[in-house]
Amino acid sequence: MKIVNTLILIGAGLAAHAPVQARIAEYQLDNGLKIIVQEDHRAPIVVSQVWYKVGSSYELNGITGVSHVLEHMMFKGTENLEPGEFSRIISANGGRENAFTSRDYTAYFQRLEKSRLPVSFRLEADRMRGLKLNEEEFKKEVQVVMEERRLRTEDNPEALPYEQFSATAYLSSPYRTPVIGWMDDLKNMRLEDLSSWYQQWYAPNNATVVVVGDVQSSDVYELAKEHFGPLKPSVLSQVKPQQEASPKG
């Protein structure tokens, strides 16, 4: 899993060379799910992404890093899939997949041959509301994230000072906490923290599906209705605005 702090181009490599006047279609299902489609017919490939409007800036003290740990756990099984089966299915269909967490969002994506888009939608819809959080898998993934933090931050002579600088420079903004979380919070994280976070934010009315590739927009919309339409929306928490304190002097 890769943490990034800036928006990636929609559709990765496909969108990098897309026509300037590319046609973009937008839809919204009755349950609140937003759908954005950009047609690109130069190759029989499709990139499908699901963006959730939640990231490290939403986290409270004591559970920093929960968004990123949950990102890892999204690959560890649902009511219908065993741990790791999501990735195995994508690979068996000739695809590639990954995910990333940032301050304001968490996103998951797959790149597949265009006829395999239903596979992506079926799997993403399944884990949007049917994730099965397992204590044993959770303990392993927290250790993975802690090691990731050691490697990328604590043992990095450039990253560690920058993290400390950000925590000092931002007095009240939620951007002061690292996306990966503070080590003490990771050590003390509980499965219940992830479960609450998942139930709170992972819902169709807090998600946007983005599809770029050799598709017809209307077909993508119908496919989204089939797979995501039955999912029930959630009552989303109102995020209290947190603005940085005004500088003085």
Question: Where do the model's predicted regions map?
Answer:
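Non-catalytic beta-strand/loop surface segments
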Residues: 18-56, 80-116, 152-206, 230-249
